[in-house]
Amino acid sequence: MKSLYDICAPAKLNLFLHITGRRSDGYHLLQSVFMLIDWCDTLHFDLRVDGQISREDLATPLPFDDLVVRAARALKAASGSPLGVHVGIEKCIPAQAGMGGGSSDAASTLLALNHLWRLNFSLEKLISIGLQLGADVPFFLGGHNAWVEGIGEKMDPVVLPSGRFLVVKPVEGLETRLIFSDPALKRDSETAIISGFAANAFGFGRNDLQSVAQRLCPGVTQALEWLASRGLSGRMTGSGSAVFAQTLQDVDLRGAPSGFQVRLCKSLDVHPLVGWAVSDRLSVGSA
């Protein structure tokens, strides 16, 4: 195998996001449900036998903070593989949107290179590498919609009803760090239970980060008001700045504020690459 083309990296929406506390080390405790949607980046991988890692759209030296580059380097370091890769990306998921685009790209890179380099790493091994890259990377590696708790490390798969969602990304983005460090952030939400969520999956709870985001980024409020003008009740995903609303019928996408990205998306039951890495637990159970 010398190449892998058209590898999908889907975005996610946070159906709700509650902050339930803050640890002594500064990390926030949260509850959320992460749902995959069909707004995707597309990645292409060409094998390099010289051991080098390169990106079609980036000159050398490669930026240290690029998640795709970091994922490839982390997998190479963990495996000791002498092989390299040339990566191309068709970037569609907006940055600083709360949709997990960078983390999803990193996860798809780990899964693809596990095949291209013939490493046969287990899913658990890839997740341990993904944890070094970002809190959302393990979710995308897991391949299923999930109930998420703790600082984001506790995940349980959930089955969600299918849905269509109008997603709106303002021109401005938001830095996660600024949202979580804001003194006005609500950090004392009561602990939710999954049965309460299941009774109203697409309307449960709220996003505790939203009020802070609206103050820092007026575009969030503009996007929510535009959804409301279409008769839709919206909320922010993640730390923003994208917002979304479930829609049961076709919506006129015209008239959005200038420069805003608007897309009608469908939920995904599973990640397009689910099964690309085998779980250790599955291997033991089927032996």
Swiss-Prot record:
Top-rank taxon: Bacteria
Swiss-Prot/TrEMBL keywords: ATP-binding, Isoprene biosynthesis, Kinase, Nucleotide-binding, Transferase
Cleavable signal peptide: none
Matches recorded under InterPro entries: GHMP_kinase_C_dom, GHMP_kinase_C_sf, GHMP_kinase_N_dom, IspE, Ribosomal_Su5_D2-typ_SF, Ribsml_uS5_D2-typ_fold_subgr
EC numbers, comma separated: 2.7.1.148
One GO term of the biological process aspect: terpenoid biosynthetic process
Top-rank EC class of the record's enzyme: transferase
Binding positions for ATP per the UniProt entry: P94, A95, Q96, A97, G98, M99, G100, G101, G102, S103, S104
A Pfam cross-reference name: GHMP_kinases_C
Family membership noted in the UniProt record: Belongs to the GHMP kinase family. IspE subfamily.
Functional description taken from the UniProt entry: Catalyzes the phosphorylation of the position 2 hydroxy group of 4-diphosphocytidyl-2C-methyl-D-erythritol.
Record's protein name: 4-diphosphocytidyl-2-C-methyl-D-erythritol kinase
Gene: ispE
